[in-house]
Each structure stands twice: as C-alpha cells, then as structure tokens.
Regions:
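Compact, glycine-rich, soluble single-domain proteins
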Residues: 1-73
Length: 73
C-alpha cells in the first residue's frame, strides 16, 4: 500500500488505514481524515512539505510526516 505522501497532484484516493498513536492519530482523525474517506491531492510543495488536500469539501495542509501516516488506495 502507498501513503498519501506518495500520491501525485490531481489524484483522488481513498483512506484505507491510519498509522500513528495517541494524540497524533487523533489529530488526523479530528481533521476528518478517517477510513473510507476520499482525499483529493491539490498541491505538493517542491520539497514535499506541505501537501495540500481536499477532504469532505474543505482544504487542508498536511505535514509530510502526517501524510506518511495515512495509507491510501
């Protein structure tokens, strides 16, 4: 499986699993990123940090480390 960090701009993927523990995982889930949710990758900064995505109709910027914890398909 690949992570959200590996997804190219303009692609829509589905969240399959969240890695991480405790507060980090909770923060990602509080942003609306949960299993089964479609995520559209809008932009990736030149060095890969941050990644700009659209989730549930709103836009988010995720750190590279957070994007690596989100397994997608």
């Amino acid at each position: 499986m690949k992570t959200l960090r590996e997804v190219a701009c303009g692609q829509t993927v589905t969240v399959m699993r969240l890695h991480g523990e405790g507060p980090v995982k909770r923060r990602i889930m509080d942003m609306g990123i949960t299993k089964g949710v479609p995520v559209y990758v809008r932009k990736v900064a030149p060095l890969g940090d941050p990644v700009e995505v659209t989730v549930r109709g709103y836009e988010l910027s995720l750190r590279k480390a957070d994007a690596e914890m989100i397994e997608v398909e």
